[in-house]
């Protein structure tokens, strides 16, 4: 059975192809998209019904031809046409296969789902007439390459972008509103569905409510007067960084799907029931989950082709180049997440082989090389099987375990890279040998071939040299930090001279003057008694990479990352996050209250969110402005354009994950008579949330952070960024 056809399954419950994001097709930004058909034969049916009967260019291809899907790079029924042929591409003339911007066509036979009824069903050819405003360009038109101008080429690329975006939004809808919703309704635990689908809901809302409507309006309505794509992509490209979280979780999600399919009959029944529906296109859940992983590179390829055909003096040139930079950054962000997960997977595999003998699963560790090797006995020259694991900071010398299950290797020697030396030797009775010398032991090893020996020697030498360079850099950095380290005493406390502690000129038993030595000793004793970790993040201090600082308002010891807030524009005014949010942004005078009194008079700070966040804390949430519930709000660093609202505390379940792009922030009207003070409204489409902070200062901090995130600029405040306006005749709290 070809992927372009699907069998009928009337006994299965039909699933709506698109969810209802608003009250109707006209009230939702996806109104036009909701009118589009879904399914492998839907587009062909509509196309054939509207085409003339004698037009051979619109006929379906033979059953042996595969349907290319430019969105995912593999053959699937998501393509709206049976065969695409771009006349403006250099390879279109005389080519038996469609030219799709150089993307290879792959098969998806492994992802097919067997149907109960193997009989193929012919397309009926009956369907709704397509909307002329959203009718895509049909590349089957017989236009030669010489007749296709540059503006037409750009229009073809823009229409291809719109076409693939519409198909992609349907896939996202299928994942979020069909698979995830049905599994939740079937009673699958929330942590399982969250682990499988990650932040797919935020990705779906971004594309369905913002990117797709912008592209539809520009390409179908405004292209004749404003033929541009760069301004839209430049505005929305920063939000593509949210794909990093999905990509990083992808392997774990695949494992959860496989595990729950095998162990839970209910989970398996729900998945198989959906996969048999026409809306699923005869493809598995795993196939659809791969779409977001491949989407950002597709944008990059399309935009590169767009820039290649865009004239140098075009008005859209600058915006398009900037958009390509932002999309490439988002792609690099996803690739970095993939590489990080692959590195951790390698460490986990080694950890399992060693039976947990060595704690090597650490983001700072990196596996450089591993392999089996022979060890030469110093007594009789016999060889013994051994295994080497070379990391960036240590080498593990292991022996095989003689057991069928469980641990495969045991660590015989752990050799630090800083003390490691490698030497090539030539022995008449043993070829391909070299010696590794450590602090406690020397090993004479033998490889199978001379090339393998040279490779081990080169890799070990390069690893040792790189480790030495890093150590020298850390030592230099540590010396610079020691010179620039700030005093640990608060500026409010007077610095006592040594003469006030002991009379000047009083000698110790050895005849020396103990003034300076006494102060050094007391400073060291005080530091030893302090907590070893930061008050805010809890990370342990060290003398090189994690220096300690003291908050100038509350006096608590904090790290450099948690003391980036300043009460005034000077280095001597570092304060912690809690004091920065609650205290006036002016340094305390010597005659004011002591730091202890300031800490007692200040309101209770919010507990620290264990996840890295741009801003987090406790807020009150209401859906109607009358009933309020306490929630934990956070703007995560990994997804800075999303506001997460959790029930109760940071350990509670996720209530809302609100994409901040396109949101509006307003102040409530006094006539509403809200019970909670320091409140504001957050609008997204037709939905409104009422939020309230404990104090006016915290309210201003939240408004500033939300206003920055709404404009997609989390690196800093943009000049001229709009702030929420209060209703006329009222004062902003």
Curated annotation (Swiss-Prot):
<feature type="binding site">
    <location>
        <position position="534"/>
    </location>
    <ligand>
        <name>Zn(2+) 1</name>
    </ligand>
</feature>
<feature type="region of interest" description="Disordered">
    <location>
        <begin position="481"/>
        <end position="535"/>
    </location>
</feature>
<feature type="binding site">
    <location>
        <position position="554"/>
    </location>
    <ligand>
        <name>Zn(2+) 2</name>
    </ligand>
</feature>
<feature type="binding site">
    <location>
        <position position="559"/>
    </location>
    <ligand>
        <name>Zn(2+) 1</name>
    </ligand>
</feature>
<dbReference type="InterPro" id="IPR011993">
    <property type="entry name" value="PH-like_dom_sf"/>
</dbReference>
<protein>
    <recommendedName>
        <fullName>FYVE, RhoGEF and PH domain-containing protein 3</fullName>
    </recommendedName>
</protein>
<dbReference type="GO" id="GO:0005737">
    <property type="term" value="C:cytoplasm"/>
</dbReference>
<feature type="domain" description="PH 1">
    <location>
        <begin position="366"/>
        <end position="465"/>
    </location>
</feature>
<feature type="region of interest" description="Disordered">
    <location>
        <begin position="712"/>
        <end position="733"/>
    </location>
</feature>
<feature type="region of interest" description="Disordered">
    <location>
        <begin position="586"/>
        <end position="612"/>
    </location>
</feature>
<feature type="compositionally biased region" description="Acidic residues">
    <location>
        <begin position="118"/>
        <end position="129"/>
    </location>
</feature>
<feature type="compositionally biased region" description="Basic and acidic residues">
    <location>
        <begin position="517"/>
        <end position="533"/>
    </location>
</feature>
<dbReference type="InterPro" id="IPR035941">
    <property type="entry name" value="FGD1-4_PH2"/>
</dbReference>
<feature type="binding site">
    <location>
        <position position="576"/>
    </location>
    <ligand>
        <name>Zn(2+) 2</name>
    </ligand>
</feature>
<feature type="compositionally biased region" description="Polar residues">
    <location>
        <begin position="106"/>
        <end position="117"/>
    </location>
</feature>
<keyword id="KW-0863">Zinc-finger</keyword>
<dbReference type="Pfam" id="PF00621">
    <property type="entry name" value="RhoGEF"/>
</dbReference>
<dbReference type="InterPro" id="IPR055251">
    <property type="entry name" value="SOS1_NGEF_PH"/>
</dbReference>
<feature type="binding site">
    <location>
        <position position="537"/>
    </location>
    <ligand>
        <name>Zn(2+) 1</name>
    </ligand>
</feature>
<feature type="compositionally biased region" description="Polar residues">
    <location>
        <begin position="47"/>
        <end position="60"/>
    </location>
</feature>
<dbReference type="InterPro" id="IPR035899">
    <property type="entry name" value="DBL_dom_sf"/>
</dbReference>
<feature type="domain" description="PH 2">
    <location>
        <begin position="612"/>
        <end position="711"/>
    </location>
</feature>
<feature type="region of interest" description="Disordered">
    <location>
        <begin position="1"/>
        <end position="134"/>
    </location>
</feature>
<keyword id="KW-0597">Phosphoprotein</keyword>
<feature type="domain" description="DH">
    <location>
        <begin position="153"/>
        <end position="337"/>
    </location>
</feature>
<feature type="binding site">
    <location>
        <position position="551"/>
    </location>
    <ligand>
        <name>Zn(2+) 2</name>
    </ligand>
</feature>
<comment type="function">
    <text>Promotes the formation of filopodia. May activate CDC42, a member of the Ras-like family of Rho- and Rac proteins, by exchanging bound GDP for free GTP. Plays a role in regulating the actin cytoskeleton and cell shape.</text>
</comment>
<dbReference type="InterPro" id="IPR001849">
    <property type="entry name" value="PH_domain"/>
</dbReference>
<dbReference type="Pfam" id="PF01363">
    <property type="entry name" value="FYVE"/>
</dbReference>
<dbReference type="GO" id="GO:0008270">
    <property type="term" value="F:zinc ion binding"/>
</dbReference>
<keyword id="KW-0862">Zinc</keyword>
<dbReference type="Pfam" id="PF22697">
    <property type="entry name" value="SOS1_NGEF_PH"/>
</dbReference>
<keyword id="KW-0344">Guanine-nucleotide releasing factor</keyword>
<dbReference type="GO" id="GO:0005856">
    <property type="term" value="C:cytoskeleton"/>
</dbReference>
<feature type="binding site">
    <location>
        <position position="579"/>
    </location>
    <ligand>
        <name>Zn(2+) 2</name>
    </ligand>
</feature>
<feature type="zinc finger region" description="FYVE-type">
    <location>
        <begin position="528"/>
        <end position="584"/>
    </location>
</feature>
<feature type="compositionally biased region" description="Polar residues">
    <location>
        <begin position="1"/>
        <end position="11"/>
    </location>
</feature>
<keyword id="KW-0677">Repeat</keyword>
<dbReference type="InterPro" id="IPR051092">
    <property type="entry name" value="FYVE_RhoGEF_PH"/>
</dbReference>
<dbReference type="InterPro" id="IPR013083">
    <property type="entry name" value="Znf_RING/FYVE/PHD"/>
</dbReference>
<dbReference type="InterPro" id="IPR000219">
    <property type="entry name" value="DH_dom"/>
</dbReference>
<dbReference type="GO" id="GO:0046847">
    <property type="term" value="P:filopodium assembly"/>
</dbReference>
């Amino acid at each position: 059975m070809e992927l372009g056809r699907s069998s009928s399954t009337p006994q299965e419950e039909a699933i709506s192809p698109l969810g209802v994001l608003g009250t109707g097709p006209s009230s939702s930004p996806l109104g036009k998209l909701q009118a589009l058909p879904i399914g492998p034969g839907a587009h062909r049916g509509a196309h054939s019904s509207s085409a003339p009967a004698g037009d051979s260019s619109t006929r379906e291809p033979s059953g042996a031809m595969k349907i290319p899907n430019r969105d995912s790079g593999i053959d699937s029924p998501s393509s709206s046409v049976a065969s695409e042929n771009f006349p403006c591409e250099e390879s279109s003339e005389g080519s038996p296969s469609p030219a799709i911007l150089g993307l290879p066509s792959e098969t998806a036979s492994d992802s097919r789902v067997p149907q109960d009824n193997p009989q193929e069903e012919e397309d009926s050819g009956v369907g709704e007439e397509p909307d002329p405003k959203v009718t895509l360009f049909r590349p089957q038109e017989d236009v030669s390459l010489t007749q296709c101008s540059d503006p037409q080429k750009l229009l073809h690329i823009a229409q291809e972008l719109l076409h693939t975006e519409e198909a992609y939004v349907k896939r996202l809808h299928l994942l979020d509103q069909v698979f995830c919703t049905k599994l939740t309704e079937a009673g699958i635990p929330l942590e399982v569905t969250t682990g499988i689908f990650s932040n797919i809901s935020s990705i779906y809302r971004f594309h369905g409510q913002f990117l797709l409507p912008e592209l539809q309006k520009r390409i179908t309505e405004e292209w004749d007067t404003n033929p541009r794509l760069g301004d839209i992509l430049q505005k929305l490209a920063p939000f593509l960084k949210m794909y990093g979280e999905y990509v990083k979780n992808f392997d774990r999600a695949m494992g959860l799907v496989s595990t729950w399919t095998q162990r839970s009959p209910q989970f398996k029944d729900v998945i198989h029931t959906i996969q048999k529906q026409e809306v699923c296109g005869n493809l598995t859940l795993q196939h659809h989950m791969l779409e977001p992983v491949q989407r950002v590179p597709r944008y990059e390829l399309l935009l590169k082709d767009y820039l290649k055909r865009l004239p140098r003096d075009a008005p859209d040139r600058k915006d398009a180049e900037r958009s390509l930079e932002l999309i490439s950054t988002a792609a690099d962000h996803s690739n970095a997440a993939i590489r990080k997960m692959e590195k951790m997977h390698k460490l986990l595999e080694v950890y399992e082989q060693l039976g947990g003998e060595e704690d090597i699963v650490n983001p700072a560790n990196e596996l450089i090389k591993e392999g089996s090797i022979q060890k030469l006995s110093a007594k009789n020259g016999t060889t013994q099987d051994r295994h080497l694991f070379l990391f960036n900071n240590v080498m593990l010398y292991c022996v095989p375990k003689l057991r069928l299950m469980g641990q495969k290797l045991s660590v015989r020697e752990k050799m630090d890279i800083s003390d490691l030396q490698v030497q090539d030797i030539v022995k008449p009775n043993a070829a391909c040998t070299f010696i590794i010398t450590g602090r406690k032991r020397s090993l004479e090893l033998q490889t199978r071939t001379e090339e393998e020996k040279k490779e081990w020697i080169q890799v070990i030498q390069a690893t040792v040299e790189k480790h030495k360079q890093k150590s020298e850099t850390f030592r230099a950095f540590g010396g610079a930090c020691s010179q620039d380290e700030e005093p640990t005493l608060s500026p409010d406390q007077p610095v006592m001279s040594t003469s006030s502690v002991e009379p000047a000129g009083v000698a110790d038993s050895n005849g020396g003057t103990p003034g300076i030595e006494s102060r050094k000793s007391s400073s060291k004793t005080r530091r030893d008694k302090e907590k070893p970790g930061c008050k805010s993040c809890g990370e342990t201090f060290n003398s090189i990479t994690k220096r300690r600082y003291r908050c100038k308002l509350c006096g608590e010891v904090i790290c450099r990352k948690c003391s980036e807030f300043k009460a005034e524009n000077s280095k001597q005014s570092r304060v912690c996050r809690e004091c920065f949010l609650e205290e006036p942004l002016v340094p305390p005078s010597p005659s004011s209250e002591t730091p202890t009194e300031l800490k007692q008079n200040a309101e209770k700070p919010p507990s620290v969110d264990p996840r890295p966040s741009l801003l987090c804390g406790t807020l009150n949430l209401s859906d109607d402005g009358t009933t309020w519930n306490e929630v934990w709000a956070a703007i995560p660093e990994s997804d800075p354009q999303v506001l997460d609202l959790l029930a109760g505390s940071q350990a509670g379940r996720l209530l809302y994950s609100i994409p901040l792009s396109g949101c509006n922030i307003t102040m409530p009207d006094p006539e509403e008579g809200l019970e909670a003070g320091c409140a504001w409204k957050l609008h997204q489409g037709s939905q409104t949330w009422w939020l309230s902070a404990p104090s006016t200062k915290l309210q201003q901090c939240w408004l500033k952070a939300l206003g920055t995130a709404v404009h997609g600029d989390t690196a800093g405040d943009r000049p001229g960024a709009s702030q929420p306006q209060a209703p006329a005749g009222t004062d902003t709290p």
